[in-house]
């Protein structure tokens, strides 16, 4: 089902599905029991633009920590549960806004019913998570290996288990580290369910490889009109996940706001440290709430012309640089003042 037509689900004070904006999610990578570290990381993620946060709940101490964590953050809190149904119940009792479980490994029908009963009482959505790495043996044998068909069949089977308990406040996530398999599976699943989908490429890798895999996979899936929440899974600081997710959504026209920085690839004419300058500009504009394009160009020869599509830009020279607006040179400034001049222009943009 395309995102405009998926079932509307409330997660804390946020709403997904039914054509609502695609929300950005991440997951903490510090022990949930360490409340101070967990809250500090979540607040950093919030500042970067994270809209839903997931924490692992492997034990009772972690479940109890959720209550204190929730008091100090400002976005919905999702509990990630593996195997132990008691942790799912404890997480909900301690304020989780959503739980993520695999109904197939929670301990049987009776225990699943106990989890669903609490979710129903508190109106807490359940995210059904299926990963290609843990696909059931019978489905691997049925389809001759790990396949998109097997992943989708597994997910729908798990959804039915919850529906049979009389509950339909459900979000589905299916993940694979194989990008094309993940794309195929999401296209298949979207045609078979009305539930909103959380989209991500699992085990995607480091910042470099993970960004490439996620950009391709999420880009295709989202462009097809599929997906209600996303996560760019990276091995590293989760704040990097948020930066990447925002850029993916902006590139696809699914998110407005925030300055887009473009820069030239450099050539032999470049007379300034363009790589360093571009990185400085990107960091500098991160907290400026403008919906414009900024160009950072390496020379005065092609810089103005190539920056025509940008709202404003700078181009380097020998000891000096140019301030450009819509391809027109506005003024020359010393190289040492380029960054400050650009920032001043941006801060006074609407004046």
Where are these regions (language model features)?
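Hydrophobic faces of well-ordered beta-strands that scaffold small-molecule active sites
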Residues: 22-28, 53-55, 77-81, 99-101, ...
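Active-site mouth loops of central-metabolism enzymes
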Residues: 19-37, 56, 75-83, 139-152, ...
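Glycine-rich, proline-tolerant flexible connector loops at the mouths of alpha/beta enzymes
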Residues: 29, 34-35, 46-69, 100-108, ...
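Alpha-helix-loop-beta-strand connector modules within alpha/beta enzyme cores
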Residues: 60-81, 114-126, 186-197, 281-283
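Hydrophobic or amphipathic alpha-helical targeting/insertion segments
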Residues: 86-127
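Catalytic alpha/beta core domains of metabolic enzymes, predominantly
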Residues: 131, 139-286
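Glycine-enriched alpha-helix->loop->beta-strand junction motifs that scaffold or abut catalytic
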Residues: 72-75, 92-99, 120-123, 190-196, ...
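N-terminal amphipathic alpha-helix/helix-capping segment at the start of soluble metabolic enzymes
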Residues: 1-26, 120, 283
């Amino acid at each position: 089902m395309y995102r405009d037509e998926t079932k509307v689900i409330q997660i804390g004070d946020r709403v997904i599905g039914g054509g609502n904006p695609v929300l950005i999610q991440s997951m903490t990578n510090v022990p949930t029991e360490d409340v101070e570290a967990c809250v500090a990381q979540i607040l950093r993620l919030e500042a970067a633009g994270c809209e839903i946060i997931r924490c692992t709940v492997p034990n009772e101490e972690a479940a109890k920590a959720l209550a204190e964590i929730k008091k100090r953050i400002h976005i919905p809190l999702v509990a990630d549960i593996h195997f132990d149904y008691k942790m799912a119940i404890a997480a909900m009792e301690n304020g989780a806004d959503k739980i993520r479980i695999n109904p197939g490994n929670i301990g049987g029908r009776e225990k699943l019913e106990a989890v669903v009963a609490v979710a129903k009482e508190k109106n807490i959505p359940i995210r059904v998570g299926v990963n290609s790495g843990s696909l059931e043996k019978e489905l691997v044998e049925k389809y001759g290996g790990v396949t998109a068909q097997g992943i989708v069949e597994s997910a729908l089977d798990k959804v039915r288990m919850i529906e049979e308990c009389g509950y339909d406040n459900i979000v589905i996530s299916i993940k694979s580290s194989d990008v094309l398999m993940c794309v195929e599976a999401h296209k298949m699943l979207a045609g078979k369910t009305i539930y909103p989908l959380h989209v991500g490429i699992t085990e995607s890798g480091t910042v470099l490889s993970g960004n490439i895999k996620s950009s391709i996979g999420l880009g295709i899936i989202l462009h097809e009109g599929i997906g209600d929440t996303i996560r760019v899974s990276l091995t590293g600081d989760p704040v990097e996940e948020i930066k990447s997710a925002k850029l993916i959504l902006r590139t696809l026209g699914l998110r407005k706001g925030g300055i887009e920085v473009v820069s030239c690839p450099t050539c032999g004419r470049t007379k300034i440290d363009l790589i360093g300058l571009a990185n400085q500009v990107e960091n500098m504009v991160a907290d400026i709430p403008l919906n414009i394009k900024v160009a950072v160009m390496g020379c005065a020869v092609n810089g103005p012309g190539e920056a025509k599509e940008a709202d404003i830009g700078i181009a380097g020279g020998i000891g000096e640089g140019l301030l450009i607006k819509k391809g027109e040179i506005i003024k020359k400034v010393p190289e040492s003042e380029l960054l400050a001049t650009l920032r001043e222009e941006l801060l006074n943009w609407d004046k």
